[in-house]
């Protein structure tokens, strides 16, 4: 099955390479995606997938608690300003709550519309399985609805029977109810709450269901968790970060002890920022089979790391903005431009189109105003060190300018704030060192993996079989004319025939190894090179590809594998053919 970027589907025949071979076909152009069943490939029956545990459920519940506490304290504080007659503070506080929420709800509802919509004139994706050796998947296209069925490795197209009138009526009623419910949820600004609850439901279903459905629900739970983590990351840096700077600036400007409500709002915004960053990194690592997952200990230490560094950063901003408001605005814009240019210069590869990549880089530039955010593959030690050296100098300069405007002899309160900025930043750097030295998940997940195994857990069963060819032929060194002549003359002089160009080295007879029984399962081939960490895989951000994969995955009696196109394999094959 091939899914192009325009939503159409085509059928691809069985591939000879199986689950471990690379996709040697396809144009590989930008924006063109092929998700195909590459034929029956060996999938070990004894390869269990990850399980949804109680701590995963508790993590989602804590995320919901952080979400509600952040929004509730901000709205409560805005109402307090309104009752006190402070219309300016009320307007700014409410603006930083409603505007980011509206943007995120529109984006969330747009995702829902695409995920739940159907092409015009065709029914939606329908899947069915009858026997263990039959895989049936009906994939919608723009022109017609067809069913793709493989039996004993041979694909064929069969027309899908039209649904009965009663079934079609019930289907339309159910769809209408879902549309009304989702519209109401997003109008109430609860789209993220719905996605959190849905991720929780899918995770629990993956724990309670059988093996095949367990994998299916776990896969959908990862998709939902990825969506809500990206939405929360966008919202927190559009809402919580400006709200935190605003309330701290007002607090410093008034020069009095904070009220309980103001302190709660500041604390909730700070925790929301730190929690969202750690949660995003955890979901990103959990979604990639080529990286070790982030443990909950590491996630908690990440929360503390970001909590203290962002606290020092925002307090330095608030101190400077309380005295030099115009210069603070110039500083923020200049810092954002420099950081955005730095990100663009690094040539990130997160999105599927150029314009989406530019918007993403601009959002990352906003994040870099407050904290570190890894967007480039490879070792990040030098980049982290450079970033925090710049942040340290900026914090010291902003705090120093503010302190120079105070009365040195009598204002002991100012000295305390300077010490708070310094100690908070030092604590954040300490927790960052603890994370990278003790809790950072280094290395590939459980050793080398077959490309794209959806649910890897043990390296043995999930890897390629022993009789599969996993590496392409290497390029041969060119033979010069002198070497050819010398070899010919030497062979004639010695009176011995010239040895053959290719020789087969005798090896030891294969030792029989007991292997578990295998069931035949499809390999879903994606005609795109796999994005490297810390980018999301294409099947997480391309919703067309996601819909096709979910339909194929649900219809297969055995767990399919995702297989991205290997750029290195294509280059090596081309070099080999040219050389020989």
UniProtKB/Swiss-Prot annotation:
This is XK-related protein 7. GO terms for biological process: apoptotic process involved in development; engulfment of apoptotic cell; phosphatidylserine exposure on apoptotic cell surface. Belongs to the XK family. Residues 1-22 have a biased composition (Low complexity). It is found in: Cell membrane. The gene is Xkr7. It comes from Rattus norvegicus (Rat). GO terms for cellular component: plasma membrane. The chain crosses the membrane at residues 59-79, 89-109, 260-280, 303-323, 326-346, 355-375, 384-404, 415-435. InterPro entries: XK-rel (IPR018629), XK-related_scramblase (IPR050895). It is a multi-pass membrane protein. Keywords: Cell membrane, Membrane, Transmembrane, Transmembrane helix. Its main location: membrane. Residues 1-28, 470-516 are annotated as: Disordered.
């Amino acid at each position: 099955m091939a899914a192009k970027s325009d939503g159409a589907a085509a059928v691809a025949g069985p591939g000879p390479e199986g689950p471990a071979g690379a996709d040697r076909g396809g144009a590989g152009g930008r924006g063109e995606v092929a998700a195909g069943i590459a034929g029956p490939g060996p999938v070990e029956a004894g390869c269990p997938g990850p399980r949804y545990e109680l701590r995963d459920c508790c993590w989602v519940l804590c995320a919901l608690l952080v979400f509600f506490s952040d929004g509730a304290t901000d709205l409560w504080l805005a109402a307090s300003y309104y009752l006190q007659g402070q219309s300016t503070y009320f307007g700014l506080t409410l603006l930083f709550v409603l505007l980011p929420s509206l943007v995120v709800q529109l984006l969330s509802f747009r995702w829902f519309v695409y995920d739940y919509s159907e092409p015009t004139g065709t029914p939606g994706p329908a899947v069915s399985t009858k026997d263990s050796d039959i895989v049936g998947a009906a994939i919608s296209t723009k022109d017609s609805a067809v069913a793709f069925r493989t039996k004993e490795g041979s694909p064929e197209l069969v027309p899908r029977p039209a649904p009965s009138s009663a079934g079609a009526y019930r289907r339309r009623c159910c769809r209408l109810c879902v549309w009304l419910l989702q519209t109401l949820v997003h109008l109430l600004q609860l789209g993220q709450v719905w996605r959190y609850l849905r991720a929780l439901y899918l995770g629990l279903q993956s724990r309670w269901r059988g093996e095949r459905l367990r994998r299916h629900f776990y896969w959908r739970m990862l998709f939902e968790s990825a969506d809500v983590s990206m939405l929360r990351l966008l919202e927190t840096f559009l809402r919580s970060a400006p709200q935190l700077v605003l309330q701290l600036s007002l607090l410093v400007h008034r020069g009095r002890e904070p009220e309980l409500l103001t302190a709660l709002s500041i604390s909730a915004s700070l925790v929301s920022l730190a929690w969202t960053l750690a949660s995003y990194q955890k979901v990103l690592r959990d979604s990639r089979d080529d990286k070790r997952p982030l443990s909950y200990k590491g996630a908690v230490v990440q929360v503390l790391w970001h909590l203290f560094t962002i606290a020092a950063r925002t307090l330095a901003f608030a101190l400077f903005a309380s005295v030099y408001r115009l210069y603070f605005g110039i500083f923020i814009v200049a810092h954002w431009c420099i950081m955005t240019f730095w990100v663009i210069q690094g040539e990130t590869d997160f999105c599927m189109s150029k314009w989406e990549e530019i918007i993403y880089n601009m959002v990352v530039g906003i994040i870099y105003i407050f904290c570190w955010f890894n967007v480039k593959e490879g070792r990040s030690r030098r980049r982290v060190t450079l970033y925090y050296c710049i942040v340290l100098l900026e914090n010291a300069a902003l705090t120093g300018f503010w302190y120079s405007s105070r009365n040195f002899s009598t204002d002991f309160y100012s000295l305390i704030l300077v010490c708070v900025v310094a100690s908070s930043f030092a604590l954040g750097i300490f927790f960052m060192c603890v994370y990278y030295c003790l809790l950072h998940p280094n290395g590939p997940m459980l050793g080398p993996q077959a490309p794209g195994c959806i649910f890897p857990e043990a390296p043995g069963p999930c890897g390629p079989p022993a009789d599969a060819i996993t590496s392409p032929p290497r390029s041969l060194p060119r033979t010069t004319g002198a070497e050819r002549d010398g070899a010919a003359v030497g062979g004639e002089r010695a009176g011995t025939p010239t040895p053959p160009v290719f020789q087969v080295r005798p090896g030891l007879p294969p030792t029989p190894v007991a292997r578990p029984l295998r069931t035949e399962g499809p390999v879903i081939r994606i005609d795109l090179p796999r994005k490297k960490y810390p980018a999301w895989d294409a099947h997480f951000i391309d919703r067309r590809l996601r819909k096709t994969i979910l339909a194929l995955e649900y219809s297969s009696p055995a767990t399919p594998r995702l297989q991205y196109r290997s750029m290195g394999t294509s280059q090596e094959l081309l070099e080999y053919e040219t050389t020989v």
